Each structure stands twice: as structure tokens, then as C-alpha cells.
């Protein structure tokens, strides 16, 4: 989505405004390398477990889409690492601008969208804890998931196609140099749309968690003195979603506003431009951290995922049998895919 940012230099006095290569070519590639290995292991394990869990609720459907999105994002990290570390050739940098950078932002906003849907689902679970999903609701969740993927794909595809200019030299410093005139216009349009996507989901998270907090407080007042400590612990787990959302996505979208201004208007001096660049890259790394934090959501909020993971760690060959046990419980009327009612 924001391919222009990844390999960019600031406008204006670009040749005079240099950056610390130890940060741009060493530190950030090392940080992304850590994320790559941690994310590949945790999300690969999550994918294996989710293949064994039936989609018996909207919650599970949204989680499965999230893990797919996270894995796609993680697979773009090696290209960014090589490009940022200046270890790649000209064709690699062109490939990053044209493909992997676009996929990175494509998956970021898919993850944001599904976190918003998961938040709505958790609010419904809080207010109506014993409501079960019916086939019609499940079909609606699947259709909505397909619509999100299709919409983001249609937004992203032109960014790939319209990055079609031949580089003037081997070292492509700005992805915008490779975009056609309409490609630059489309890129700007997509940026605005993605901003809208974020702020809509930001409002969803704020509103839903305000209502969830009120509902949990009412529940606490009603049961005060009864001593239901285990239940209180379960209630707290739901707040992991808002924690992940604010840690990973909020800083980047606030930092992005002044950074974009520094890229489009010559209103900052060199020191300010570099500071904004480092802040943008740091917060962009936090958005990538989401791929490593999402498995905590799966573990704490999805009982069948947690049970399967614990069983797999204790005995790798028992995961399949546990999946069969889960399906048997579902046939008997239980739903092991949901957390204990809040």
C-alpha cells in the first residue's frame, strides 16, 4: 500500500540530508530478522492447529483469516531485510517496490479489519455469552471474509501493475520513481482509503471496549461478594485484543501524518525529517510485531486452540486425537471453539 515509504529519501535537500546507516541498514534489518523467525515459528504452529479446528463460530473464522494474513506478511520480511540492508541488487529492490511492499500493506489492513470484526464478536460474546452460532451466521462471516480479501486485493493490484517504469539506475531509492503518473495518483487514493479503514476500526475498538468494560463492571457489581475469582480472570483476557491493536497499529497511523507531510512538502529541516523517518520506521516495525502478538490472542481467547497447543507440546502425536475429541464434543452439542462465557 505504502510502497513509496519503504525505500524513500526525503525531498528537498535529499543529497545533503543523510541518515545513520547503522540504524537504517543494520538495526532495522536485525529487528525484522527477529520478527521473521519468531513469527514464522509461532504462526506456522498456529496454522497447523487451526487446520484441525472446525469453523464452528464467527470467531474461529476470523482467527483463521488473521493467521493467513500474518503468514503472508511474514513472508515479505526477508525481501525487506535484504533491501534495507543494501544486500540486494537492483531487480530485488524493484521487486520489493512492485510486489512485497504492496503485499505487506495489503496484509496489514486485512489484519486491522479482522481485529475490528473480532472485537465486535467479543462484544457480542460479552453481552450474550450463551448465544451459539447458526449456519446462516457462519455463512455470513465467510462471505464477509471473502469480501475483505477481495476488496483489499482489488485496491492493491493496481499498485503492482502501475509500478511499471524502468529504473534509471541500479539503486532505486524511491519506489515512486517506478510508478507511472496514474500510479502515483492511485497510490495516494489507496492511502486515503487505508486511513479510513484504520480509523473506522479504531472507532469500533474504542466503542466496543467501552461497552465491554461497562458490561463487565455491571457483572462484577452483580456478583460482588460471591467470590468468582476464576471468572474474573477469564473476563480480563478479552482486553488482549485492544492491547495488541494499540501497541501495533495506533503509533504508526499517528506518526504517518507528519511523516507524509515531510515527504510531500518541504517544511522540515534535515534533523526533523530524519527524526520523522526513524519514528515512522520504528512504528512500522510495531505493525509487523502484530504478526507475533496475534498468537497470544489465539491462545488466551480460543479454548480449542489452547487445548490443542498444550496437547501438541506435551505429545506431538496427540494433536490429531484432540482435534477428533473436539469434533466429537461439537457433535454432542458443545462448542469447544469458544472461550468460557464472559
Curated annotation (Swiss-Prot):
Tissue distribution of the protein: Highly expressed in the platelets, lower levels in the brain. Lowest levels in the lung, appendix, pituitary and adrenal gland. Expressed in the spinal cord and in the fetal brain.
One Pfam family it belongs to: 7tm_1
Impact when changing residue 159 to A: Slightly decreases affinity for ADP
InterPro entries per record: GPCR_Rhodpsn, GPCR_Rhodpsn_7TM, P2Y12_rcpt
Binding residue positions for ADP: 93, 97, 105, 156-159, 175-179, 187, 191, 256-259, 263, 280
Membrane topology field: Multi-pass membrane protein
Effect in UniProt of substituting residue 175 to A: Abolishes ADP binding
Transmembrane segments: 28-50, 62-82, 98-118, 143-162, 186-207, 234-259, 279-298
Glycosylation site positions: 6, 13
The entry's keywords: Blood coagulation, Cell membrane, Disease variant, Disulfide bond, G-protein coupled receptor, Glycoprotein, Hemostasis, Membrane, Phosphoprotein, Receptor, Transducer, Transmembrane, Transmembrane helix
This protein's GO CC annotations: cell body membrane; cell projection membrane; cell surface; membrane; plasma membrane
One GO process term, biological-process aspect: positive regulation of ruffle assembly
GO molecular function annotation: G protein-coupled adenosine receptor activity; G protein-coupled ADP receptor activity; G protein-coupled purinergic nucleotide receptor activity; guanyl-nucleotide exchange factor activity
Free-text domain note: The transmembrane domain is composed of seven transmembrane helices; most of these are not strictly perpendicular to the plane of the membrane, but are tilted and/or kinked. Agonist binding promotes a conformation change in the extracellular loops that leads to an inward movement of the transmembrane helices. Antagonists such as AZD1283 can bind to an overlapping site, but block the inward movement of the transmembrane helices.
Stated family: Belongs to the G-protein coupled receptor 1 family.
Disease linked to the protein: Bleeding disorder, platelet-type, 8: A condition characterized by mild to moderate mucocutaneous bleeding, and excessive bleeding after surgery or trauma. The defect is due to severe impairment of platelet response to ADP resulting in defective platelet aggregation.
Protein name listed in UniProt: P2Y purinoceptor 12
Organism expressing this protein natively: Homo sapiens (Human)
